[in-house]
Amino acid sequence: MFLKRNRQTAKQKPLTMKDNRKKKTIQLSAAALGGLFWCMSTPLHAQEYTNFVLVNLDDVGYGDFSCNGAYGYTTPHIDSLAAQGVRFTHFLACQPISGASRAGLLTGCYPNRIGFAGAPGPDSDYGIHPDEMTMGELLKQKGYSTAIFGKWHLGDTHQFLPLQNGFDEYYGLPYSNDMWPNHPQQGEVFHFPDLPTYDGNEVAGYNTDQSRFTTDYTERAVKFIRKNRKKPFFLYLAHSMPHVPLAVSDKFKGKSEQGLFGDVMMEIDWSIGEVVKTLREEGLLDRTLIVITSDNGPWANYGNHAGSAGGLREAKATTFDGGNRVPCIMYWEGHTRPGSICNKLASNIDLFPTFAEIAGAPLPVRKIDGVSILSLVEGRKNADPRTSFVYYYNKNDLEAVTDGEFKLVFPHKYVTYEAYNPGNDGQPGNLANVTLTRPELYDLRRDPGERYNVIAQYPEKVIELNKIAEKYRKELGDDLTRNKGKERRSPGKKHAPVH
């Protein structure tokens, strides 16, 4: 039961940045009015819509759910959704670092297309550009109530905060929970100010006890669902955990066999269980798509305070698959096939157009990179909507490209977690800098851990993947080959005038 998606015509004249912002505003205003009249004239039971619950975890690796092989703790609520829904095995975060990954998730774009890089902190001068349509704004076109509880990371000044970018409610952190005065390297490497917790546009406190966050976010999520039970809603639950520093409430302290990290994961699983229970109690489970994923792989040099990449190579902040490949589970009663596994290539930037298709919301005028993966969610035969993915990192380095079966890695510098032992109990271990001097090719079908270079055996694959890379170098550029790219847009800048 889908609302038909509005499609833009090929002859539509491109808008300027200023015009596009007006267009975005007009779309939202018109949609709000249309939704008002629709609600006034149509009985609630006759309205057909799908709610969206998007749970985006922080630094959860591919192997950190028990259905993916986690050890020393269990995640029964997550596992139950996997058993009833679809588990993706080749789901890639658009970049292996928090801020950029979240910017891509919420706009459907490779982060470098929208000028977004890295993990902005309290001293950063950039954030989400006002002309970029976020997932919140996308769904508000169709009358959705929207909320984010948790980590934002798309900029920390007023113009960048959620309430100015498509969300009705916000409670949480503007950036990572380690960007505070209690950082283990404070005064040596970092000089962080006090960490604000926001409630809407106002600071509710500084350096909040982080053991409260998972429970606080969950309670607000439950309240939001109950308040909006009779109308469409989008809940973005962006837990601050298990990013370091780890913190857990008393009710889960000491519960796992894997120490504090396991305790934190058990509490996150409880949180997801509370959300599912609320949806069931309100009779909404059959009209809600639930997505559980992570922003990037684990921060492996934190040792027993870090997650597991599940045997994949390297971890967060690298474009080997330990950094980009993340768990993803989707459940949508009546649409996902119980216990199904999807091995097809997909990315977090694909959620934006997927939600748009389900909600019948028009896509933004500005170009996006995501493709709808609704066909994969529903398990349609021979569905294969994403045929390639490019791995960008740093400001604009194109480090690798894949077609889902083979991955071509280009020469680049990266940090390795494999040269030193990891740290422990909240202290990070050392990292080593490595330079890859020649391209390498990996057969991900047989070697998902990227250990065996088969570039000599598959010269035709190298040619195919290089063609894909060249296409993106022309569009988005590549600092490694000194290509500027013709289709990159600018991020928002602090204190920049908004027209």
Per-region residue spans from a language model:
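Formylglycine-dependent sulfatase
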Residues: K18, L28-L33, T42-E440, P448-K467, ...
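N-terminal secretory signal peptides that target proteins for export/translocation
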Residues: M1-T25
